[in-house]
């Protein structure tokens, strides 16, 4: 029964006591009645409690050193980048907590989004994922190359926000404190430093579209994704507290840095210093270099924190294979241990795996596929061979010259 007005019996709300004549509607349950005003009040209380839970979570953000310790458990190398990210992420969530807990407007803390520059397989995506996981905030990944500006065939930038909302189980309040990682940002650089009259579909126009949501706006997001249509119901989300981390390889930017520093050497030789390799040049990147590469000044201005990641060497890749909590070698050892089999990788085998990843220019990202190639036959055959107690992976096995060594009880 809903809104039923009987002349014989006057119904009263079980919560506030108001009669059916004093409210717009009363909803009946099993010997319980609730009016429309109490329903509205309940919804408001629930909304406030959810917001308080989010704010409470923000007050417990790990300190920069604690964040660095978490990153060190999973990410090998990239020490400068990890420190920069730890400070930036801590300051971001401290800013949200500070802003929402103060009533005065004496200080306006600006959002500091992050730009990560580094070669393929250096750990950009994994760093962002690990940070989001350690903070227990919603996380979404987008590929900049799939985005187009409004009016062209492709994916609207608002669809990035939909991915974050979905990661938050459609809890918009949680999504508004999440992290979005946009990969391949260097692929939407302008094709030249000079502004062109004609705009490329996936270049400067996409930067302009991303700029709006990165700097903070109330965006309208189609619940099912895709293009917006008239009369379509939208999800409203405020992006002012969403942390945006964008990353890319920026192949060739070290040459821009060399050119800039070279000009300084010619003009001001006594104040210059020699830089020996490309890795060191990456640590010298400034906004001017990124602009010359093709990102527009307004976009760069919204990414004040720049973290440069270095190319991983053989030693780094071996440590990645063996040291982190989720190290690939540990994972495969655990899998075979369920069959009662011990797994050992010889040092030369680890060096061969790392060497292949470097040859393929895939970095850490390519390690799993190389191990999969090496381990496929073992993972297929050994579970059925009860007499096998140990498997030893050699350099020759990695290179395909022989099979892994099996030890039998």
UniProtKB/Swiss-Prot annotation:
GO molecular-function term, one example from the UniProt record: protein dimerization activity
CDD domains in the record: RecA-like_ClpX
Positions bound to ATP: 119-126
Gene Ontology annotations of biological process type: cell division; proteolysis involved in protein catabolic process
Entry GO CC: HslUV protease complex
Binding site for Zn(2+): 13, 16, 35, 38
Domain ClpX-type ZB residue range list: 1-54
Matches recorded under SUPFAM superfamilies: Glucocorticoid receptor-like (DNA-binding domain) (SSF57716), P-loop containing nucleoside triphosphate hydrolases (SSF52540)
InterPro entries named among the record's database cross-references: AAA+_ATPase (IPR003593), ATP-dep_Clp_protease_ClpX (IPR050052), ATPase_AAA_core (IPR003959), Clp_ATPase_C (IPR019489), Clp_protease_ATP-bd_su_ClpX (IPR004487), ClpX_bact (IPR046425), P-loop_NTPase (IPR027417), Znf_CppX_C4 (IPR010603)
SMART domains: AAA (SM00382), ClpB_D2-small (SM01086), zf-C4_ClpX (SM00994)
UniProt keywords, alphabetically: ATP-binding, Chaperone, Metal-binding, Nucleotide-binding, Zinc
Keyword Chaperone among UniProt keywords: yes
Primary role: ATP-dependent specificity component of the Clp protease. It directs the protease to specific substrates. Can perform chaperone functions in the absence of ClpP.
NCBIfam families in the record: clpX (TIGR00382), PRK05342.1 (NF003745)
Subunit relationships: Component of the ClpX-ClpP complex. Forms a hexameric ring that, in the presence of ATP, binds to fourteen ClpP subunits assembled into a disk-like structure with a central cavity, resembling the structure of eukaryotic proteasomes.
Family: Belongs to the ClpX chaperone family.
Protein name per UniProt: ATP-dependent Clp protease ATP-binding subunit ClpX
Lineage of origin: Bacteria, Bacillati, Bacillota, Bacilli, Lactobacillales
